[in-house]
Amino acid sequence: MSKQTLSFQAEVAQLLHLVTHSLYSNQEIFLRELISNASDACDKLRFAGLNQPALFEDAPQLEVRVSFDQTARTLTITDNGIGMSQQEAIEHLGTIAKSGTKDFMGQLSGDQKQDAQLIGQFGVGFYSGFIVADKITVESRRAGLPASEGVRWASGGTGDFEVETIDRPARGTSVILHLRDSAEEYLNNWKLKSIISRYSDHISLPILMEKQEWKDGELINPGDEKGGRQPGAMVKTGDWETVNQASALWARPKKDVSDAQYAEFYKTISHDPLAPLTWAHNRVEGSTEYTQLLYIPAKAPFDLWNRDKKAGVKLYVKRVFIMDDAEALLPTYLRFVKGVIDSADLPLNVSRELLQESRDVRAIREGSTKRVLSMLEDLARHDRHDSPAPQPAEGADRVSDVVDADDKAKEGKYSQFYAEFGAVLKEGLGEDFANRERLARLLRFASTSSDQASVGLADYKARMKEGQEAIYYITADTLAAAKHSPQLEVFKKKGIEVLLMTDRVDEWALNYLHEFDGTPLQSVAKGAVDLGKLQDEAEKKAAEEAAEAFKPLLARLKETLKDKAEDVRVTTRLVDSPACLVVHGDGMSTQLARLLKQAGQQAPETKPVLEVNASHALVRKLDGSQHFDDLAHILFDQALLAEGGLPADPAAYVKRVNALLV
């Protein structure tokens, strides 16, 4: 059989049906697409007019107009851009997925492409009009052609179209949508303005709509005011007004934007009445080019911990709004950041509603993350004397300096930020390996030296005692529980500072942070305490002798508590308390196990180690007591209570205590 090369065939009517009914998830996007096409047409004329000024004819001011006729049930989008000849209308409107804008971009030089604000690229946006219209009529005349060479194109979206020559004095294009009965909402001035404000507020061209004003109805009985009136209505005045900003604050040079304007823009995009703590506005130049304006809020939203809630910055492509929560452009642990990212390089799906993973997306994500961390490092430096921030990696994209108020105004802001978002920032230790060191420098904790969450790891390390070999910390449910934990007693005695960690995320996060600047982090509630050079030989010898002398008692305790404790041993960490619970060095703490169970997740069934203070009177009283079993269980349950836990059988605990009291 001979080999053949054949072309794919398409059922045009079915293809149009798919484009108009399956491609777009949001019906109102049709207006964004048609306004973007109109903007492209004006931009094409702007470029063509550089060499042929006569193309502007007698209307050099480029604009887009949106109007509607409730009686005729039509919605019209008109531009005075480049327009189309009859042949161009047949080629561009009669061929699905043929992008005139993409063809035009291919004819521009490199510098012209940089300056162009052309939006379209797929050649299907026009057909989104059929989402709301059962017929579309296009009237157009190409700039430079006589008025007699206008063209009218019309189609019902069923696979065929009609074309005829018309007289059209004005250059440019009018797209007339004959709306379906179900699309009556788009014959409403307020509705159209809200869509334009959402999607096309920042394109560089003015978008005009006819003004409306309220007009009272006629008197039911002429001359009789008391007889009532017919219902009033909004009526058109004949004057046109600009309904978009026609500029993008983030596209302006930073020197031309005041702090007040930055703050006001933040309130507009975030719906937050409070001013932001700080912001960064920069244009990144490199393999991927984009502009970003990122804000750090002053207050956490009520749903910050709702993992199902979408969060992220607003994404624009060439000033056209694409999506509200572009989660792919910032990691989850920075979900509190608000702002705008605008790029021409991002790969979108055909409907321009979804962002596709690519090298450019990853580059923007990495650059935006570094920018946010730089803002936080800047706040931290001004908040107090802190360790210097890491320098940008060699070859990183060039970014401008952070734009913010003067240095004096930054004092205290990092403490304010950390009180609101510190716990979220800790999630980054497990999510962002590349920036783990920078994140570690931004962490703040309370300690045995300060009840305020103001101690950084660098600060702690700078004041470690001579001979101290680890950064010590303890996790607990509350600050009070951490401060009064029995495990801290030997550290307090020796004047060793211990970090107090009370956020739910702490223990999970520290699974990913094992050392800081070469110094290991060690929980005082895990494993055996080895203070190394901080413990003198006499103390070590006394501990060894006590362990040997108490072997029979320890064996008896272990047998009695075999269902509760994995092991029983003499402690070196207690001074005043009779006992405490610890876990093996690589084990899950009882606190983390409790948190997992409270969250409805499975936690491994593990038993803690009971450590007893050989010098405590209660422990010494155990040997020979007729209430040995009851005292052993009470000792264990009290140790559990001291670290914020509850006895497995509270009633049995109370019964044992009562029995000893009488």
From Swiss-Prot:
GO terms for molecular function: ATP binding; ATP hydrolysis activity; ATP-dependent protein folding chaperone; unfolded protein binding. Keywords: ATP-binding, Chaperone, Cytoplasm, Nucleotide-binding, Stress response. SUPFAM superfamilies: ATPase domain of HSP90 chaperone/DNA topoisomerase II/histidine kinase (SSF55874), HSP90 C-terminal domain (SSF110942), Ribosomal protein S5 domain 2-like (SSF54211). Residues 595-662 are annotated as: C. Residues 382-402 are annotated as: Disordered. InterPro entries: HATPase_C_sf (IPR036890), HSP90_C (IPR037196), Hsp90_fam (IPR001404), Hsp90_N (IPR020575), Ribosomal_Su5_D2-typ_SF (IPR020568). One of its GO terms (cellular component) is cytoplasm. Residues 353-594 are annotated as: B. Pfam families: HATPase_c_3 (PF13589), HSP90 (PF00183). It is found in: Cytoplasm. Residues 1-352 are annotated as: A. It comes from the Bacteria. Disulfide bonds: none annotated. Coiled coil: none annotated. Molecular chaperone. Has ATPase activity. Belongs to the heat shock protein 90 family. Homodimer. HAMAP family: HSP90. This is Chaperone protein HtpG. The gene is htpG.
